[in-house]
């Protein structure tokens, strides 16, 4: 089993991003994803910056994957996507079907990211024909659903053709919209957002009228209010055939989580979830914000 550090989903200053990935070079992750997946206006790092950063990380011996945008809204964004896909050095995580098609046209293998709506065996087969070699399960699906689908893949003799990766810690990316919720929360138009996302390095918290934290606003992305945590499921995931466990790169705590998750393989330990900040409901096919201890 391998461990991955998912792409940072938030908007940070360039120096903070570079410092974070300098630390990532010596972390427990076998695979490091990086790149802008949420908003093309987040230009603290341009394409050459991301690729140069990827080259530096690759020197540490880790597999580097460039993650692409989840919602493409212009011809310019498609052109940028094509440049990433044609980088010539690094694998790509496709988070939109346009990326899947471009990579198929280029005859390049790819990772199907969690934003790709792949819920059944038929879709898995389509993605495999397109060139997928690793599939990241959509975050809202359950352990039982995953076990069933992997079993179906085994029975269809395609299971050995792809790796399975599960988002296992961090704020869950739940939905995407052409509207920018962070800008709206500051009474700004999207076209005049003044890059306000950078003021919320872990997103902007959103509470219900009852005062319960339900979501995290991150630009056009709506995330879970609590951090998803499957630390007690590492060995169960291994047993059903998960190949890669993903830790989201949302702050320096991610490095501690990588160590903690990896240690579960050698010496399993039970960690009760924090009732105020963590959740794991989706894994048990119940409300995502629920906590099962």
Task: List each model region and its residues.
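Active-site pocket-lining/capping segments in soluble small-molecule metabolic enzymes
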Residues: 1-118, 122, 126, 137-293
């Amino acid at each position: 089993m391998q461990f991955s550090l998912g792409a940072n989903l938030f908007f940070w200053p360039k120096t903070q991003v570079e410092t974070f990935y300098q630390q990532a070079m010596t972390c427990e992750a076998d695979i490091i994803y990086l790149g802008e997946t949420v908003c093309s206006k987040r230009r603290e790092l341009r394409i050459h910056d991301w690729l140069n950063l990827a080259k530096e990380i690759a020197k540490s011996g880790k597999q580097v994957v460039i993650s692409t945008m989840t919602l493409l809204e212009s011809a310019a964004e498609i052109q940028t996507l094509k440049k990433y896909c044609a980088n010539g050095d690094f694998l790509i995580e496709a988070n939109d079907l346009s990326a899947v098609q471009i990579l198929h046209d280029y005859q390049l293998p790819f990772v199907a990211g969690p934003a790709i709506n792949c819920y059944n065996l038929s879709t898995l087969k389509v993605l495999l024909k397109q060139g997928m070699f690793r599939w990241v399960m959509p975050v809202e699906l359950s352990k039982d659903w995953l076990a069933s689908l992997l079993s179906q893949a085994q029975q269809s003799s395609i299971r050995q053709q792809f790796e399975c990766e599960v988002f296992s810690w961090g704020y869950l990316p739940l939905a995407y919209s052409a509207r920018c919720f962070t800008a709206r929360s500051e009474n700004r138009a999207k076209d005049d957002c003044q890059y306000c996302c950078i003021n919320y390095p872990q997103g902007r918290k959103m509470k219900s009228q009852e005062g319960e934290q339900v979501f995290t606003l991150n630009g056009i992305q709506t995330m879970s209010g609590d951090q998803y945590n499957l630390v007690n499921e590492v060995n169960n995931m291994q047993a059903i055939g998960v190949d890669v466990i993903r830790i989201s790169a949302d702050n320096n705590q991610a490095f501690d989580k990588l160590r903690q998750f990896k240690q579960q393989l050698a010496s399993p330990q039970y960690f009760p979830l924090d009732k105020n900040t963590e959740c794991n409901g989706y894994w048990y096919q119940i409300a995502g914000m629920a906590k099962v201890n």
